[in-house]
């Protein structure tokens, strides 16, 4: 834990310096009621103070637990937050596109993530803030995020932290138990949880990535398949290798 707290302080100093050099006023991020966004919020508040951090709580068919978790987070942690109702915008968009969220729930879920991204960047530009992502090392390694959705950010503070490290920081910051004990979820569709969707637990993934666990052939296939499907998420848009001579 001592090394983790040392890393945290180095991270906070780096964040502060980077934002200052960027001539931004502060940082903005989505607050979902999950443990990753809660830890990012705690880091942001401690680093930049109340006025220069902003948590957007974006409502799109959120669960009752989402409401309870975000409410308790804001009340206990005293985050600077704004509630944004996006449900009407989401419903209008999927209707315009002819998408039924109950049938094509994955497409609809990714639209939710991208609508939140649009909202974050609109507020970021309005207030001269930089956008903080909430993804951890496991999610980035497997590509478990929505391209141009929750994967879009200016700074990814948790990018080198395992899920177990995020839990340790949550304890360090005294994050409410309702957040720590709930099943990790991106809240993309009803009943969705990260571990059910991936087919493997964060504990297994943490141990595997540290080299402390040899996965079964079935679990190895899950990890390799997830990484292969998400490879494009880690790359810039592909360009045709043959250069066009535009001078002729």
Swiss-Prot record:
Binding locations of deamido-NAD(+): 114, 147, 154, 232-233
Enzyme category, top tier: ligase
Binding residue positions for Mg(2+): 36, 139
Gene Ontology cellular component terms for the protein in this record: cytoplasm
GO function terms (MF aspect): ATP binding; glutaminase activity; metal ion binding; NAD+ synthase (glutamine-hydrolyzing) activity; NAD+ synthase activity
GO term, biological process aspect, one: NAD biosynthetic process
A Pfam entry, by short name: NAD_synthase
Biochemical pathway: Cofactor biosynthesis; NAD(+) biosynthesis; NAD(+) from deamido-NAD(+) (ammonia route): step 1/1
InterPro entries reported for this sequence: NAD/GMP_synthase, NAD_synthase, NH(3)-dep_NAD(+)_synth, Rossmann-like_a/b/a_fold
E.C. code: 6.3.1.5
Record's catalysed reaction(s): deamido-NAD(+) + NH4(+) + ATP = AMP + diphosphate + NAD(+) + H(+)
Record key words, sorted: ATP-binding, Ligase, Magnesium, Metal-binding, NAD, Nucleotide-binding
Residue positions binding ATP: 30-37, 134, 163, 185
Subunit: Homodimer.
Family the UniProt entry places it in: Belongs to the NAD synthetase family.
HAMAP family recorded: NadE_ammonia_dep (MF_00193)
Function: Catalyzes the ATP-dependent amidation of deamido-NAD to form NAD. Uses ammonia as a nitrogen source.
Protein name in UniProt: NH(3)-dependent NAD(+) synthetase
Naturally occurring in which organism (per UniProt): Mycoplasma genitalium (strain ATCC 33530 / DSM 19775 / NCTC 10195 / G37) (Mycoplasmoides genitalium)
């Amino acid at each position: 834990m001592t090394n983790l707290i040392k890393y945290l302080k180095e991270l906070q100093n780096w964040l502060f310096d980077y934002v200052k050099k960027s001539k931004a006023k502060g940082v903005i991020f989505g607050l979902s009621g999950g443990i990753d966004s809660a830890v990012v919020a705690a880091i942001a508040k401690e680093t930049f103070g109340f006025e220069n951090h902003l948590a957007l709580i974006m409502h799109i068919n959120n669960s009752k637990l989402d409401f309870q978790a975000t409410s308790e987070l804001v009340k206990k942690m005293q985050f600077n937050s704004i509630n944004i109702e996006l449900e009407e915008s989401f419903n209008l968009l999927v209707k315009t596109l002819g998408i039924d969220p109950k049938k094509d729930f994955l497409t609809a879920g990714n639209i939710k993530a991208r609508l939140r991204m649009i909202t974050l960047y609109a507020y970021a530009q309005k207030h001269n803030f930089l956008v903080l992502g909430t993804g951890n090392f496991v999610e980035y390694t497997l590509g478990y995020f929505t391209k141009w959705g929750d994967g879009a950010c200016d700074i990814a503070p948790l990018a080198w932290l395992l899920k177990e490290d995020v839990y340790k920081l949550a304890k360090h910051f005294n994050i409410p138990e309702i957040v720590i004990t709930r099943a990790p979820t991106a809240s993309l569709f009803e009943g969705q949880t990260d571990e059910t969707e991936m087919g493997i637990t964060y504990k297994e993934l943490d141990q595997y990535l540290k080299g402390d666990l040899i996965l079964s052939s079935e679990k190895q296939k899950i990890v390799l398949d997830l990484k292969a499907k998400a490879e494009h998420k880690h790359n810039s848009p592909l360009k045709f290798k043959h250069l066009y001579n535009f001078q002729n």
